[in-house]
């Protein structure tokens, strides 16, 4: 590399749920120099720390990558909005803050799927290391980690939802992140004193004064640089538009997320050779699995009008109520502003004979015609409304994400193929019937004035599936586009090293071979912890 290029031991691309962890953990060693590159801004907007403020961020291209899918054949050709975090903390700065590890047996299945070292016993220490959770069994829950996790305070709707689940026969559970990952409960959330606890706050804030850690924001990684088959640095576009390079004497660590990591691998010459030639990218290593195997959760929501003003809709309909809740939040860090609108959940089996739950259900404190609406004008219902929704935890539908331009600032092609597999359709219908049954229970029905979408009576299999196709949207849990496994059908090995080259790892949700259970943020933070383990072990080895 050019002698004038700034040199580091490690260059990390992306400061999201895993990249921030890596930057903090690697810079614990004062003898190494770490550079963290982030395309977005610092996470200084007040809407980041105020949980309910997330609605202001998800449509703002200063804080998210605004993208959408290709038309979805099985969703009546709808294009689904697909934002991801673009600031320090990445998507942990704009997600629902729901803290879910995943079912222990699914990690054991990772280990069996050519991912040695990834069983639940292997990953449990990393889960415990990342968290502080004051409740729960100390044999399974961390008590002194950077990410503060709390159980959400019950509100009338979440309490009713959990009780109604029990009335249908769903067990109630104190801690779904323990070995018994099944049943209904209040949500666990990554909150610190009523404020969002993203990875920037949890990991970068304590580390950023270290002399050996440099954090650069507003830069777009253009490609990974190679000498032969070894990654030696990163070329990036600086805020002034000038192309610069940073050298990595030890490793480049790609943490750009399930959408951007496969795109950047392709722009760096790692991917399907035919596709790379069409892009005009020199081939470094042919691997047709880059960008393939995409999996995501997709959720239909049943909307209801509430008999009492318990919902976020009510805040948007009344300045007085909005002001009252804001004052409550600023003085106590409690109330609706201390949530992202989701408080109660249930992990359930939609049919007999399953070894573990196959669906997650939830109650949300909003209703409307547009999921990310932030006002009555943009689609929030002009009445006290809420939804109950759910999704198949282990979708069989598979899609892809691929670069369509050599410009890293342009969104890639996103094709999740939602509900393309008949099993996904069958489970979706079954869980929607479960939601209807929950709404009919005494604990829940006393709070319901009417069903708004779909109306009561539209409960046949075809009607429910039709509604799901018309209204479902992403849960923002994409994975597997740089999946971990055997070299014959994967992108990285069980230590996250990219096949076919050296000096390059991927550490983010893109490496997950298949879905664990539900939300991906906490498992991705765990991936960051494990990646740091592997890198440190390799330092010690050599």
Label the predicted regions.
Residues 20-54, 119-122, 260-286, 425-430, ...:
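Classical protein tyrosine phosphatase
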């Amino acid at each position: 590399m050019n002698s004038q290029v700034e040199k580091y031991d490690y260059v990390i691309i992306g400061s999201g749920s895993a990249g921030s962890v890596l930057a903090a953990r690697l810079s614990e060693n004062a003898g190494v120099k770490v550079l963290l590159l982030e395309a977005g801004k610092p996470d200084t907007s007040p809407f980041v720390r105020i949980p309910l403020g997330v609605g202001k961020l998800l449509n703002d291209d200063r804080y998210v990558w605004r993208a959408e899918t290709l038309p979805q054949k099985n969703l009546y050709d709808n294009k689904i909005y697909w934002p991801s975090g673009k600031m320090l903390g990445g998507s942990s700065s704009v997600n629902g803050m729901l803290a879910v590890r995943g079912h222990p047996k699914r990690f054991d299945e990772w280990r069996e799927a050519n991912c040695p070292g990834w069983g639940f016993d292997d990953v449990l220490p990393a889960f415990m290391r990342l968290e502080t959770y004051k409740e729960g069994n100390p044999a399974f829950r961390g008590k002194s980690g950077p990410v503060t996790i709390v159980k959400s305070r019950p509100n009338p709707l979440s309490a009713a939802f959990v009780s109604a689940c029990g009335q249908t026969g769903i067990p109630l559970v104190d801690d779904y992140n323990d070995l018994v990952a099944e049943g209904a409960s209040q949500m666990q959330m990554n909150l610190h004193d009523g404020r969002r606890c993203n990875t920037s706050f949890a990991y970068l804030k304590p580390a950023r004064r270290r002399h050996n850690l440099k954090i650069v924001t507003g830069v777009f990684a253009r490609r990974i640089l190679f000498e032969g088959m070894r990654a030696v640095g990163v070329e990036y576009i600086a805020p002034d538009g000038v192309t610069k390079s940073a050298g990595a004497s030890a490793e480049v660590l790609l943490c750009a997320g399930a959408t951007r990591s496969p795109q950047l691998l392709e722009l760096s010459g790692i991917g399907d050779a035919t596709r790379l030639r069409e892009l005009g990218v020199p081939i470094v290593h042919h691997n047709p699995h880059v960008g393939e195997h995409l999996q995501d959760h997709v959720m239909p929501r049943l909307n209801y009008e509430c008999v009492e003003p318990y919902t976020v809709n009510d805040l948007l309909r009344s300045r007085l109520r909005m002001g009252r809740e804001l004052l409550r939040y600023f003085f106590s860090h409690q109330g609706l502003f201390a949530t992202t609108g989701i408080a109660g959940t249930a992990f359930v089996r939609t049919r007999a004979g399953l070894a573990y739950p196959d669906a997650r259900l939830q109650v949300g404190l909003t209703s409307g015609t547009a999921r990310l609406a932030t006002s009555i004008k943009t689609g929030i219902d002009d009445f006290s409304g809420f939804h109950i929704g759910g999704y198949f935890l282990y979708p069989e539908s598979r899609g892809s994400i691929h670069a369509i331009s050599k410009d890293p600032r342009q969104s890639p092609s996103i094709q999740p193929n939602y509900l393309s597999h008949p099993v996904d359709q069958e489970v979706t219908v079954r869980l929607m019937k479960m939601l209807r049954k929950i709404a009919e229970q005494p604990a829940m029905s006393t709070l319901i004035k009417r069903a708004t979408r779909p109306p009561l009576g539209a409960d046949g299999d075809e009607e429910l599936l039709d509604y799901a196709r018309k209204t479902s949207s992403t849960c923002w849990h994409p994975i597997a586009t740089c999946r971990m496994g055997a070299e014959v059908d994967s992108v990285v090995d069980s230590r996250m090293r990219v096949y076919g080259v050296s000096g390059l790892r991927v550490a983010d949700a893109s490496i997950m071979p298949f879905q664990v259970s539900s939300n991906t943020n906490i498992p991705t933070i765990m991936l960051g912890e494990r990646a740091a383990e592997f890198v440190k072990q390799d330092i010690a080895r050599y």
